[in-house]
């Protein structure tokens, strides 16, 4: 989302863009995703959620690491889980994370406006079959005329952790392509 927001505002500063398994609020049928019951965390922000999660960051994130992976055994490694839990336990970290979701409605307004002017640069969209699947690729085609979409079969949201041997070559090949 951050990459799209940047490139939509400053397209002359970017040669190409990669989106990985995060939908674009305000583009196409975005509310279908935004309102999915399983994605309740999009609406979980403010003081009460902060108090509920404080001191329980690891428990909160375990749900996402496990349930958003195609196979929890090949999701985020234990050392990384410990690092993220420690990091998000720092003052202000969870609030900052929750604010991403609080701002979805404003992002939707901004992205809808950005989408009125289609990008023309090469865009690679990598998404997990058991996560966004074709949805993100379809969204990308609404905002860019030069989209290459790849659905990583049998994988979920954590593409770098679940399928590095598939993702890294895709990234390298895309980055090294000449326009």
Annotated model-derived regions:
Residues 4-151, 160, 172-179:
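Flexible "cap/lid" subdomain of the alpha/beta-hydrolase fold that forms the substrate-access gate
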Residues 155-168:
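Catalytic histidine-centered segment of alpha/beta-hydrolase-like enzymes
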């Amino acid at each position: 989302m951050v990459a799209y927001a940047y490139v939509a505002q400053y397209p002359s500063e970017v040669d190409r863009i990669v989106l990985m398994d995060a939908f674009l609020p305000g583009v196409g049928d975005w509310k279908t995703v935004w309102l999915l019951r399983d994605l309740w965390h999009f609406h979980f922000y403010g003081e009460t959620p902060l108090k509920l999660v404080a001191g329980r960051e690891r428990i909160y994130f375990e749900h996402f690491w496990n349930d958003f992976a195609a196979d929890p055994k090949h999701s985020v490694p234990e050392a990384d889980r410990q690092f993220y839990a420690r990091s998000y336990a720092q003052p202000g970290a969870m609030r900052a994370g929750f604010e991403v979701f609080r701002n979805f409605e404003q992002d939707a307004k901004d992205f809808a406006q950005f989408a009125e002017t289609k990008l023309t640069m090469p865009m690679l969209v990598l998404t997990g079959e058991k996560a966004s699947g074709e949805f993100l690729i379809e969204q990308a085609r609404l905002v860019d005329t030069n989209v290459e979409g790849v659905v990583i079969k049998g994988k979920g949201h954590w593409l770098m952790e679940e399928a590095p041997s598939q993702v890294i070559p895709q990234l390298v090949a895309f980055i090294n392509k000449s326009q």
